[in-house]
Regions:
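Structural signature of Gram-negative outer-membrane beta-barrels, strongest in the C-terminal barrel
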Residues: 228-235, 245, 337-340, 345-355, ...
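N-terminal periplasmic accessory domains that precede
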Residues: 67-70, 89-93, 129-132, 144-168, ...
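Periplasmic-side early beta-strands and strand-to-turn transitions of outer-membrane beta-barrels
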Residues: 159-160, 166-168, 180-276, 308-319, ...
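C-terminal beta-signal and adjacent terminal beta-strands/loops
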Residues: 543, 547, 601-608, 626-677
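Membrane-embedded beta-barrel scaffold of Gram-negative outer-membrane proteins
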Residues: 178, 290-315, 444, 450-456, ...
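Surface-exposed extracellular loop regions of Gram-negative outer-membrane beta-barrel proteins
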Residues: 250-265, 355-367, 412, 417, ...
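Gram-negative outer-membrane beta-barrel transporters
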Residues: 348, 396, 400, 408, ...
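Short acidic/polar hinge/loop motifs at secondary-structure boundaries
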Residues: 111-136
Length: 677
């Protein structure tokens, strides 16, 4: 397991709070405690885990306007896209979605609802907070939660009127406009605006890549339009409430834009003569019904949610033009019961869960003179699960926790097509049962200092390839499973927050791509081990001022008995990472000034299992200055990537040569927000 080299680091992490113990004070009552939607703040699952919670003001200060910018404020998290925003590449703690872009290693939740995998990268609308839970969360969250969970919590309408308008412009003719209005319709009963709690967002982030064949010079960017409506029925002095939310998002993108591997400062695409511009249009509709009933000892939650997504995608691939429209439908239902109150010896959570996903894919690969390949595929996946999570408070300082989840997964596929006039097709069905568990123990050494240990399991279910492959049968792959061992500590006072952990994760039956180039399919082909240590600290060293610092070192490798990549590094996992920021408030007679300076370091990593395509270490520096011009007006200017550092975000072998996607470089902008109330 190669844990010996981590023991000194683990010991150091446990001793860190002792250094700061001279500053011990009672924890500020306003300290935000992670709840992660499914647990009580007193549960072992919420406390015996490495977690980070970021508030809306912190997101705004860091310029986090979309989920792929969350690594700026969530240490250890890495998010990029592989081609375009439909296919996110996420890594956390050495667990990576490198081998299956339809199943990210970290699951994104919005108000307790899991998002479609192709909707993981999305604009953020009216966010109240973001929570990150590190390590497998399989017992409470089920499949595809091997690396962890990101839970976005949005602002819910209540009796307080709220409203604002926001706008900004930035480099490459980009701009952003946003409107929000919420409040009581009938005070004490129904909350929302006249038509509900409304948020409207238009976000344009243009690129600067050039297609020499068409002359287009703004490729590589996105243009998103989003609207949502919320209603909340919550009568005063009643133990129940109900909610409804609906949203629609449409994004146009030109992101399938690549340059030569060694031409990362160039703007001309590596593309065949006469090739059209890449284009993608994604539209997603979401609806959620929720209810809550509270007694003296229990709280019951019911959620039913639906998502419908369709997208069209066209891009050049060598001498071929690819058209790949796709439709997704997903519905989720969950019933959850949890204990309530602070005087209980045992806290409990019980739940029933169902998730059904259906997908249809049409694809066509055309040569200049004739069709090459066309196919139509249908896949389904369904999960039925029951889970429980218990915490036994042995004393007021010592607790132990355990959880178990039983899942029944079903999947099916049916596809047909033609390759150079030769038909192909197949169909299949599979089902599988999984039992996952987790155990943890935590002890409060002082009122501010906690140590814990945790063992938890995660998995990705069995299933079929989304994209049909000519000449191959419909053969399912089995579930990928992982187990994580963790030792950590957390120290919190009004002035200092410290968190450290060391971990080891073993993954088996990895779902890897295998087969000849152009005919690759997912199959079970290997194991991987990830070991690492992480540290996160925040010091509020003066009124209105704080200093954040974080870092991690990770070794994530395929084991020697892996069929394809034995001994190689797992792709998309940086060997190390670090970040630091200083935030402050300077009071002046003309209004408060709010400076921020942040640096982020990303270590070397590979884009392929063969470890041929390597991105070296890079660092970026971001700065901003906010001005509270009046009580209701805020103006901020910012420069992201101040020194215009260019680096690769994704790459692959195109024939005998490699191509890469690169970041956009320096971005300068200004934002203004005006509050109505």
């Amino acid at each position: 397991m190669k844990m010996t080299r981590l023991y000194p680091l683990a010991l150091g992490g446990l001793l860190l709070p002792a250094i700061a113990n001279a500053q011990t004070s009672q924890q500020d009552e306003s300290t935000l405690v992670v709840t992660a939607s499914k647990q009580s703040s007193r549960s072992a699952s919420a406390n015996n885990v490495s977690s980070t919670v970021v508030s809306a003001p912190e997101l705004s200060d860091a310029g986090v306007t979309a989920s792929d910018k969350l690594p700026r404020v969530l240490p250890g998290l890495n998010i990029e896209n592989s081609g375009n925003m439909l296919f996110s590449t996420i890594s956390l703690r050495g667990v990576s979605s490198a081998q299956d872009f339809y199943n990210p290693a970290v699951t994104l939740y919005v108000d307790g609802v899991p998002q479609l995998s192709t909707n993981t990268i999305q604009a953020l609308t009216d966010v109240q907070s973001v929570e990150l839970l590190r390590g497998p969360q399989g017992t409470l969250y089920g499949k595809s939660a091997q690396g962890g969970i990101i839970n976005i919590v949005t602002q819910q309408p209540d009796s307080t009127p709220r409203g604002y308008i926001e706008g900004g412009v930035s480099s490459r003719d980009s701009y952003r406009s946003k409107f929000n209005l919420s409040g009581p319709i009938q005070d004490g009963l129904l909350y929302g605006s006249v038509t509900g709690s409304v948020t409207l967002l238009r976000q344009v982030d243009d690129g600067d890549m050039i297609n020499p064949a068409t002359g287009s010079d703004d490729l590589g960017g996105t243009r998103a339009s989003i609207g949502n409506v919320k209603l909340r029925l919550a009568p005063d002095d009643q133990p129940w409430e109900m909610g409804f939310a609906a949203s629609r998002e449409c994004t146009r993108a030109t992101q399938d834009a690549y340059v030569g591997w060694n031409d990362i400062k160039g703007r001309k695409l590596s593309i065949s003569d006469g090739s059209p511009d890449p284009y993608m249009r994604r539209c997603t509709d979401s609806q959620t019904l929720s209810g809550k009933y509270t007694t003296d000892d229990w709280v019951f939650n019911l959620i039913s949610a639906w998502q419908q997504q369709h997208y069209s995608r066209t891009f050049p691939s060598g001498s071929l033009i690819v058209n790949m429209p796709q439709r997704w439908n997903q519905d989720v239902q969950e019933l959850r019961a949890a204990t309530l109150g602070d005087a209980r010896t045992v806290d409990m959570v019980f739940g029933l869960y169902r998730q059904n996903t259906r997908e249809k894919l049409n694809s066509a690969y055309d040569m200049p003179t004739m069709p090459y390949l066309s196919s139509t595929g249908y896949t389904t996946a369904e999960t039925l699960a029951a889970y429980s999570d218990l915490t036994w408070h042995l004393t007021d300082r010592f607790d132990i926790g355990g959880g178990v989840r039983f899942s029944h997964d079903k999947s099916s596929t049916q596809y047909h097509g033609s390759m150079l006039g030769n038909p192909f097709g197949d169909q299949g069905k599979s089902n599988d049962d999984q039992v996952l568990g987790q155990l943890s123990a935590g002890y409060m050494l002082t009122d501010d200092w906690r140590v814990y240990t945790r063992v938890a399991q995660g998995y990705k279910p069995s299933g079929y390839n989304i994209v049909p492959t000519a000449g191959l049968d419909a053969k399912p792959f089995v579930a990928e499973k992982s187990i994580n061992y963790e030792l950590g500590t957390r120290y919190e006072t009004a002035d200092v927050t410290l968190q450290a952990a060391t971990f080891y994760t073993h993954t088996k039956d990895m779902q890897l791509y295998s087969g000849p180039v152009g005919m690759q399919t997912l199959s079970n082909a290997g194991k991987a081990d990830a070991t690492g240590v992480e540290l996160e600290a925040k010091w509020r060293f003066a009124p209105g001022w704080s200093w954040d610092i974080n870092g991690n070192v990770i070794r994530s490798e395929f084991t020697n008995d892996s069929e394809l990549y034995h001994g190689n590094r797992v792709p998309f996992v940086p060997r190390y990472g670090a970040g630091s920021s200083v935030n402050g408030v300077i009071d002046t007679r003309y209004g408060a000034l709010m400076p921020r300076l942040a640096v982020n370091l990303v270590g070397p990593h590979y884009f392929d299992g063969d470890n041929q395509l390597r991105q070296g270490t890079y660092a970026t520096l971001d700065s901003s200055l906010g001005w509270q011009a009046t009580e209701r007006m805020n103006i901020s200017v910012y420069v992201d990537n101040l020194f215009d550092r260019r680096y690769r975000t994704y790459g692959y072998m195109n024939g005998s040569s490699a191509v890469a996607q690169v970041n956009m470089g320096r971005t300068v902008g200004i934002n203004t927000r005006i509050d109505f109330f």
